[in-house]
């Protein structure tokens, strides 16, 4: 177990508590190398990983950025999918034009782009419409689903469960044990594979 990442043992909630999770750097401090062990474990082959915050909105984005930087530094092509944006976009339409926007670092892209938010759903996209994920798998070594807390928007839980594995991001001093347990059980109820927990310090 690295200082960043606690693997789940037999689905035990104990492995998800802040006391047993390991600490990640803040988004501002994240550097290539900080997530090296996590990357070796989860991305030894092309993978789609959901990174979702447990109860605290926004902390998962910094973790996604750190993991993406680690992968990009190793020469892997990475796409980050902001799930809150995807839930406001019709993936059936935008997937035909799989345009992605390069971000600051080489080898990192974002999909869908802000410009592709032209059709708002009355209902969130169903997991059965996962052709967009299959298309991304054809083009990228790593797919990072940047998921807000699973109870913050309809559809987040279902999209998190579509990934090969899910990481829960816990903020020290703010995420409660009860919230972690609730999120763990909700993800497992949808068949999600819980890979571990990352502890971040609050700002």
Predicted regions and their residues:
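Surface-exposed, flexible loop/turn segments at secondary-structure boundaries
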Residues: 12, 57, 86, 116, ...
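Electropositive phosphate-/nucleotide-binding environments in soluble metabolic enzymes
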Residues: 32
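Conserved catalytic-core segment of NTP-binding enzymes
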Residues: 66, 121-203
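Conserved NTP-handling cores and scaffolds of large molecular machines
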Residues: 8-15, 46, 71, 75, ...
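N-terminal intrinsically disordered, low-complexity tails
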Residues: 1, 5-28
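Hydrophobic positions on the alpha1 helix immediately C-terminal to the Walker A/P-loop
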Residues: 63
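P-loop/Walker-type NTP enzyme "switch/lid" segment
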Residues: 21, 25-28, 36-58, 69, ...
């Amino acid at each position: 177990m690295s200082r960043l990442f606690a693997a789940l043992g037999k689905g035990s909630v104990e492995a998800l508590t802040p006391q047993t999770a390991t600490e990640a750097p803040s988004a501002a401090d994240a550097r290539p190398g900080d997530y090296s062990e996590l990357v070796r474990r989860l991305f030894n082959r092309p993978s789609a990983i959901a990174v979702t915050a447990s109860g605290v909105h926004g902390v998962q984005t910094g973790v996604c950025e750190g993991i993406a930087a680690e992968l990009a530094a190793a020469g892997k092509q990475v796409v980050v999918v902001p799930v809150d944006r995807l839930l406001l976009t019709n993936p059936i339409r935008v997937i035909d034009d799989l345009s992605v926007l390069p971000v600051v670092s080489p080898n990192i892209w974002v999909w869908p782009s802000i410009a592709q938010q032209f059709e708002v759903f009355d209902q969130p996209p169903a997991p059965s419409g996962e052709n967009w994920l299959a298309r991304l798998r054809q083009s990228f070594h790593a797919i990072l689903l940047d998921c807000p807390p699973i109870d913050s928007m309809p559809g987040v839980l279902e999209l998190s469960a579509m990934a090969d594995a899910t990481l829960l991001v816990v903020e020290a001093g703010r995420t409660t044990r009860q919230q972690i347990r609730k999120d763990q059980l909700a993800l497992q109820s949808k068949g999600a594979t819980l890979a571990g927990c990352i502890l971040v310090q609050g700002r």
